[in-house]
Amino acid sequence: MAKKESFFKGVKSEMEKTSWPTKEELFKYTIIVVSTVIFFLVFFYALDIGINALKQLFLG
């Protein structure tokens, strides 16, 4: 039982040391992540279309 209490006290201690982002930083980071995901979505979609077009060109 003492091990569990010690573990959770350690977790609480470490969580208090953590620096959490402000609302502004969180919003900024969220925009960056969503923009990056959309960029790669469009990139790989265009790549897929291009590969399929080349395949159709060569294979008929």
Swiss-Prot record:
GO molecular-function terms, A-Z: protein transmembrane transporter activity
InterPro entries attached to this UniProt entry: SecE_bac (IPR005807), SecE_sf (IPR038379), Translocase_SecE/Sec61-g (IPR001901)
Membrane topology reported for the UniProt record: Single-pass membrane protein
Key words, A-Z: Cell membrane, Membrane, Protein transport, Translocation, Transmembrane, Transmembrane helix, Transport
Gene Ontology cellular component annotations, sorted alphabetically: plasma membrane
Gene3D superfamilies: Preprotein translocase secy subunit
Coiled coil: none
Example GO BP: protein transport by the Sec complex
PROSITE patterns, A to Z: SECE_SEC61G
Membrane-spanning parts: 31-51
Pfam families: SecE
Location relative to the cell: Cell membrane
Function: Essential subunit of the Sec protein translocation channel SecYEG. Clamps together the 2 halves of SecY. May contact the channel plug during translocation.
Assembly and oligomerization: Component of the Sec protein translocase complex. Heterotrimer consisting of SecY, SecE and SecG subunits. The heterotrimers can form oligomers, although 1 heterotrimer is thought to be able to translocate proteins. Interacts with the ribosome. Interacts with SecDF, and other proteins may be involved. Interacts with SecA.
Family: Belongs to the SecE/SEC61-gamma family.
UniProt-recorded name of the protein: Protein translocase subunit SecE
The organism of origin for this protein: Staphylococcus epidermidis (strain ATCC 35984 / DSM 28319 / BCRC 17069 / CCUG 31568 / BM 3577 / RP62A)
